[in-house]
């Protein structure tokens, strides 16, 4: 099944539902960064969460950043996701591996540890909004749910999952259900929804069983006036790095540092943290940056 994002509503638009499949893009990230099993699960969950949160933004260029900093061996996760369906991300320590947790699952919580989740929403207006919440478990899903309830004050349920085996990632994605104020006033409806979500046995087992996103929506909300939007949005791992951005970053180092690179290394090499792309910068390109800096200083 192709990586995709689908939106739906229920209960006369009082319930908002978004589902995303990220199997291929998570495998792409695993290969790019040489991720271990647990690092793949951690990054895959966070990328799915980023896409789900970005799906409710309005402006075409809107993006959301999720940064997780913990005291576990993984150290940190950074994900950048957009309303346009693109996402990128990396972990600080991609090679970390841990024994399974008490449930026999990949120990993402142990890899992340205790710490904080930082969320930056760039709504597309040039004025980003930031929030910080303490990690609840380090399992990503519970932590992002905690953010939604405390910072956005929206009752939410988030299911995230990544299954990675010897052949790579075979299932990855997530589901976000939000109860809007209109539906939150109906305690019976909220209780029914909570009961069904409590019996949801993970997200990736549903994908492995052949369930599609519409199937999952129907199982949960089919008798609540479910309306699935006809548009299916494709999602993908896509970085925004470029030679121009690399040159711009190098230029900020100043003339002395650039000259030192020319004299000692006859150029420079830069690697994008988000996607692993390696950029070779020649001494001529560095010299051009120095000339630009001199011209700007003279102006």
Swiss-Prot record:
<dbReference type="GO" id="GO:0044183">
    <property type="term" value="F:protein folding chaperone"/>
</dbReference>
<keyword id="KW-0963">Cytoplasm</keyword>
<keyword id="KW-1015">Disulfide bond</keyword>
<dbReference type="InterPro" id="IPR016153">
    <property type="entry name" value="Heat_shock_Hsp33_N"/>
</dbReference>
<dbReference type="GO" id="GO:0005737">
    <property type="term" value="C:cytoplasm"/>
</dbReference>
<keyword id="KW-0862">Zinc</keyword>
<keyword id="KW-0143">Chaperone</keyword>
<comment type="function">
    <text>Redox regulated molecular chaperone. Protects both thermally unfolding and oxidatively damaged proteins from irreversible aggregation. Plays an important role in the bacterial defense system toward oxidative stress.</text>
</comment>
<dbReference type="GO" id="GO:0051082">
    <property type="term" value="F:unfolded protein binding"/>
</dbReference>
<keyword id="KW-0676">Redox-active center</keyword>
<dbReference type="GO" id="GO:0042026">
    <property type="term" value="P:protein refolding"/>
</dbReference>
<dbReference type="InterPro" id="IPR016154">
    <property type="entry name" value="Heat_shock_Hsp33_C"/>
</dbReference>
<protein>
    <recommendedName>
        <fullName>33 kDa chaperonin</fullName>
    </recommendedName>
</protein>
<dbReference type="InterPro" id="IPR000397">
    <property type="entry name" value="Heat_shock_Hsp33"/>
</dbReference>
<dbReference type="Pfam" id="PF01430">
    <property type="entry name" value="HSP33"/>
</dbReference>
<comment type="similarity">
    <text>Belongs to the HSP33 family.</text>
</comment>
<feature type="disulfide bond" description="Redox-active">
    <location>
        <begin position="239"/>
        <end position="241"/>
    </location>
</feature>
<feature type="disulfide bond" description="Redox-active">
    <location>
        <begin position="272"/>
        <end position="275"/>
    </location>
</feature>
